[in-house]
UniProtKB/Swiss-Prot annotation:
Keyword presence, Transmembrane: no
Binding, ATP: K253
Coiled-coil segments: none
Protein's recorded name: Glutamate--tRNA ligase
Functional description taken from the UniProt entry: Catalyzes the attachment of glutamate to tRNA(Glu) in a two-step reaction: glutamate is first activated by ATP to form Glu-AMP and then transferred to the acceptor end of tRNA(Glu).
Localization annotation: Cytoplasm
Gene: gltX
Amino acid sequence: MKVRTRIAPSPTGFPHVGTAYIALFNMCFAKQHGGEFILRIEDTDQLRSTPESEKMILDSLRWLGLNWSEGPDVGGPHAPYRQSERMGIYKQYALELVEKGHAFYCFATAEELDQMRAEQQARGETPKYDGRGLKLSQEEVARRLEAGEPHVIRMKVPEEGVCKFNDLLRGEVEIPWAQVDMQVLLKTDGLPTYHLANVVDDHLMEITHVLRGEEWLPSAPKHQLLYQYFGWEMPTLCHMPLLRNPDKSKLSKRKNPTSINYYRDIGVLPEALLNYLGRMGWSMPDEREVFTLQDMMDNFDIQRVSLGGPIFDVEKLNWLNGQWIKGLTPGQLLDRLLTWKSDRSTLEDIAAAIQPRINLLSEAVNWAGFYFNHMPQITAEMFESKKLTQEQVRQSLQFAIWRLESQFTWNNDTVGQTLMDLANQMGIKLRDFMPTFFIAIAGSTSSTPVMQSMVTLGPDLTFARLRHALEIVGAPSKKEVKNWEKLNESLKLPKNEATSEA
């Protein structure tokens, strides 16, 4: 049996270091066993999936030095490798489960399910599908299907007993069936959920080992059932420990930048980032800290993975990157520097922004320096304003982050309109609103136009600077976040609707 592993990212945002971490361990495991590592795009979420995000994911993984033998960009014997191009496959398997008696139709509306959950919570129960679709007679199901009523297909789940499965790192794992929901397999629009598409594709693509984050442990019983229902052999499972912030919380962009592109843009070498991710819960037999991808593949053993949550510490990453930089010759370092900021389009944008402001070429350093710095040097006092309260400064930064995060098109129009709309909806004049962003992005109110600067820097560096500024002036508490989310949404409503909502 040839070992086959995969990474299956969803193209719904910026490329996450967690994706690279799981991809690295899948690739090393496959190479250790003389097997194959493939890439599949799981884009069943048609509302949030974008070609731009897919391209960023592929480019960032390639930049790191990860390679796959099959995928949407290189083809292969199991093509297509985008789930959106495989939609016709999933429905037939869902219907097969219905015919075998392992799945059923459910006609419950969203409102009915909301009421069901509310009643369960009122009784102190954990919200869970109550199996109402199982009570329908075959005649009623046939009649409602004939009438064209909206419906989903759900999988049947045992009501009693315990699901047992083996994990490469954890040994035998037990999860009571009572904790497992009757998962939707096919949605009302005919699209599959993650669980059905994942199992079908792993089987058809002959995946033998699934290395994934431990957040998928609760889903393993559903997947085991589906393999049993289809009569297929389930791949060997291995649930990797999650990357964590220094405070042991799950790695999140609120506390640490999580985009691969961010670390590339600030000057982290791909070898160093891959080296650092390789040390997340794993170590070389000789315990050395600096090693190459080839070193890791040559010495890889999955049993050396520690289940303690690995800490993603940016300071440690910076130190490791420094070791890699110090190992370069001056000529190699120059090549890396030129490659780091070699995009002519970006440099032309910077030149155009500073051109009206300089009389000597040497003055370009002062005006353009913030484009190349890791993070501007700012203090809370710099944000003090006669026009805005501290609350308005904090909210303007947080609201801008939330709104800009939803923009997949990053240009002058989208960035500019987002900020202008926010200022207008908050009732703040633009000239009073923008200094906060000049300071957050450039470290000074004397700078090139800040909206253009944000576009030139790109979303990853922009978000990092806005979040850094928010930390400086005071990030919202969990309670404030909930209240601010509601306020941010209400600001988008027409004034009469916002008033009635209040």
